[in-house]
UniProtKB/Swiss-Prot annotation:
Cofactor section: Mg(2+); Mn(2+)
Entry binding sites for Mg(2+) 1: D356, D360
EC number(s) from the headed UniProt entry: 4.2.3.-
RNA-binding recorded as keyword: no
Binding site for Mg(2+) 3: N500, E508
Alphabetical UniProt keywords: Cytoplasm, Lyase, Magnesium, Manganese, Metal-binding
Function of the molecule: Involved in terpene biosynthesis in roots. Possesses sesquiterpene (C15) synthase activity in vitro. Does not seem to be involved in diterpene (C20) biosynthesis.
Keyword Transport assigned: no
A GO molecular-function descriptor: terpene synthase activity
Protein's name according to its UniProt entry: Terpenoid synthase 22
Domain notes per entry: The Asp-Asp-Xaa-Xaa-Asp/Glu (DDXXD/E) motif is important for the catalytic activity, presumably through binding to Mg(2+).
Organism the protein comes from: Arabidopsis thaliana
Annotated gene: TPS22
Amino acid sequence: MEAARMGFRAKTLPHLGNGTRLPLKTKLSLFPMHLLQNHTTLSRRSTKLNLCVKACSKTSGVESSRPLPHSAPDLWGDHILSVPTENSEFDTLETEIESIKPKVRNMLMSSHKTDKERICLIHLLICLGTFHYFEKEIEEILEQAFRKLDMLFTDEDDLETTAIMFEVFRLYGHKISCDVFDRFKGVDAKFKEHLVSDVRGMLQLYEAAHLATPFETILDEALSFTRYHLESLAGQQATAPHISRHILNALYKPRFLKMEIIAAREYIHFYQKEGHDETLLKFAKLNFNFCQLHYVRELKTLTKWWKDIDLPYKLPYIRDRLLETFIGVMAVYLEPHYSLGRIIATKVSQVIVVMDDTCDAYGTFSEVRSLIDSLERWDPGAIDKLPSCLRIVIQSIVETMEDIEREMKPRGRSSSVQDTVEEIKIMGRAYAEISKWARAGHVPTFDDYIELGLDSSGIRCFAMYSFISMEDCEENQTNAWFKSKPKMLRALSVIFRLTNDIAGFEEEMRRGEVVNGVNCYVKQHNVTKELAVREIKKMIRDNYKIMMEEFLTIKSVSRPILVRCFNIVRLVNLYYEEGDNFTNPNGKLKDLITSLFFHPLPL
């Protein structure tokens, strides 16, 4: 990768708030003139419209037949650049956190605490989002406690404590049996009715039941039992308002499927209204605000980079979604020390969105084919032979990856960059084939579609470039596991692909885009859309269980890598819980971005 003109340097890291320029050859928009005149996002440079040229095709008929882009404009502009991130505030937060950490560590390691009490404290740290400061201590405690599992559960009849221990052990990769919940069943093999009065126990059992592996029937039963009764409990006057809100938040989305930083913010509000430990509460608030400052500084770096390469102006059909992309990357890495990882993953994600939109929503089949052929060659010298808009797309991908390789090579992690390039090519080939189907109006069988759809989902690629900067994980071991095509990554891809297809089905069909998992299932099985969605949702649930089974059994790669795979699932739920929130971010996603980047917690 010799052709990149500028790479990361130390001064571009987020704590200095300076952006990395990834220059392209022209500042002119190369989008067709008649579409430019109707595009709402171009008001900042209207004086340049007379310089625009047609993007790809030489045939005006092709240009006039292109559909106008349907995505909403960027919601945020440059607002993030005005958010204060003073060094003094940053230093104050860091100093306070460092002063409290030993106190929390002493609570955790105290010889006066039983194993159960330590595990319950670990659970509280997970809920408050502060667990990452004590990973070594937590792993040591759980390793020792797991050796005494029988003693831990002997005579334990408290539902909340049992469910907490089950959840914590599973989250840290210990394969605890779901049989620990048998004691809460009656002679009729159903959960005992008196459990319903234990609101906290019911809520904790509900959360724990989401960590099921295949064939764990008791956890399926627990989920149905708790969901049914919690819906009723949330509406009862006898239930305290803050507990009702906590129940409703969990029923809307369990903690396991929420971004960790979002779950932490919610739980901090809940914990504050409970009988709480002031030290732990303050520590959680300081951590949230400290993470928030980190994220905003990283976003300032990324915003300057995004403005420099100026792709939304040059290619106005693309979805301009920098903050929305970044919040998805945050789902993968909560911890402040993964700043470089968040920057790298956001940059790669942004240029892949550009490629996706070009193939999916703008290019003709011949243009898509040319784009992917050039991508396969990965030859900077051949870029100038491409039509103008394709040249910009390829250049943005190639130069971004070259920048990243330049940054990672001195760190000894360049092979992950090369593997990411290969994954981008695989994704590109899938885009081309799906584009061929779509332009021909061909609806493949669901079985044919799903294999190609997994590649086009980009989730394997996303996982690969999420690992690039994880210097605490051995690169060769991680890459070898990745190349073995593990069941965990396949299950993750299925979850993303099918969740995306359900969320986008109605809009895609309105646009005449018939190559969608739901539509393919309807065709192959000759069923209604409603039945197809129901069956596909069952496939999604089954693949969650496969992921958990793999998480508990894989020994060939370190736990942090497996955790990132689960965190990508949180991204899926963030983007596609109610429609396509990435394409249309007004609503819940907009509110989440506002709360995470613009509203610190009062101390």
